[in-house]
Amino acid sequence: MRALLRSLLLLLACIAFGARADDAGPPQKEYVPKSGTGRVVVVVSGQTGASNYTSISQDFADAGYYTVLVDGNDLWIKGGGGNALLQGVIARAQASPHAVAGKVGVVCFSLGGAVGLTYATRLPDQVATVVAMYPLTNFIKDPVDFVGKIKVPVLMLAGTADTYHSCCVIEKARELADAAKANPDVAPLFVLHEYPGADHGFNMNTSHQRALVADSRDRAIAQLRQYLVDH
């Protein structure tokens, strides 16, 4: 009886420890598809916070994906560690009863785009594809070296008039695209779609460029449908 009691106490301690470990990760809000289950899509917000990306997260859920939204500020942190945090977000999402097993899609915006491009694109065992909208790229000093580390399909959506804090300019996006084209291993994986005259945040419902809200959403969903099938 005492041995059984000790085993029970040990089990409870392990469960409590696991719960604390889960709680230690960045907060993530879930959006459940109408079917109740779906392949996982992780949405990483820009610097303005997760609240500005609730609408598009719901759009992904409406498209049939179990979607979790995280704040990019929690993952793009000084001193590193964001890679492990992102993998923790993915693992928790995959452990949900609403998740269908398989690799995940990552959709990221602005600051969150740096998370997606730097970390998610290098996780081929966990990530099927990355969609990066107006991603932060001004930290990239060597485009050739950077894109050489990409291991999963990437769709980058960028506006040609994006001058927001000089974080996400089209010139750097084009440098990355050119570097990808010159690398035979990466060329099939990297697609840059430009929106002429578009500025930052073109996907938001507050955007004055209303047509781009739907177009960017539809392109993201098409990318997810293409790669969240056999992975």
Region locations from a protein language model:
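Short beta-strand/loop motif that positions the catalytic acidic residue
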Residues: 150, 156-158
